[in-house]
Amino acid sequence: MPADTPARYLAFADGSSLSNPGGPGGTGFVVVDRARPALRFGATRWVTDGTYAVTNNRMELRAVLEALDGLPEGEAVDVVSDSRYVVDALSKWIHGWRKKGWRTAAGEPVLNRDLIEALDARGRELRVRYSWVRGHDGHPVNEVVDALAQSAARGATGPSEANVIEALRAAAVIG
């Protein structure tokens, strides 16, 4: 897929951990199908994350996994995140980590390897491009996914479908 060609799906994802590490945490995502008027969004509260501590980075990665869940194999997806960690881990660092047996440049084990490998596997089923957006800088859809993640972490009701649609319109993602 050429770099300037929009993917069929556009996904925004964000994660939050109220105490980092320790949680509770939350994830939020919005997915738009550009080929037809379809929208999916959601949020999940995480009190525990298996044997791992709930951290902001784990919630950021989980939010992307939730956004990619259920998308048809082979489709192109543009994922937008305000986490440099997510964008760099999945588009840059992962190649070196694989070559080094899942070790960092410092020789340490890669943190969150389980989620990164899950995203890598899902990314191989899809055609995923990652891009970064500055967080808390007024991007309407990023603000909505942040609110979804924060609300989920607190166990509160998050933005409504009307709020999500309003943000998508404000960002000129939909008409």
Curated annotation (Swiss-Prot):
Gene Ontology CC: cytoplasm
E.C. code: 3.1.26.4
UniProt family annotation: Belongs to the RNase H family.
Biological processes annotated in GO: DNA replication, removal of RNA primer
Entry's localization field: Cytoplasm
Residues at which Mg(2+) 1 binds: 14, 60, 82
Sites where the protein binds Mg(2+) 2: 14, 146
Domain RNase H type-1: 5-154
Superkingdom of the organism of origin: Bacteria
Gene Ontology molecular function, alphabetical: magnesium ion binding; nucleic acid binding; RNA-DNA hybrid ribonuclease activity
Annotated transmembrane regions: none
Annotated cofactor note: Binds 1 Mg(2+) ion per subunit. May bind a second metal ion at a regulatory site, or after substrate binding.
Catalytic activity reported: Endonucleolytic cleavage to 5'-phosphomonoester
Keywords from the UniProt entry: Cytoplasm, Endonuclease, Hydrolase, Magnesium, Metal-binding, Nuclease
Requisite cofactors: Mg(2+)
Organism expressing this protein natively: Anaeromyxobacter sp. (strain Fw109-5)
Record Pfam families: RNase_H
Function: Endonuclease that specifically degrades the RNA of RNA-DNA hybrids.
Protein name: Ribonuclease H
HAMAP family: RNase_H
Subunit structure: Monomer.
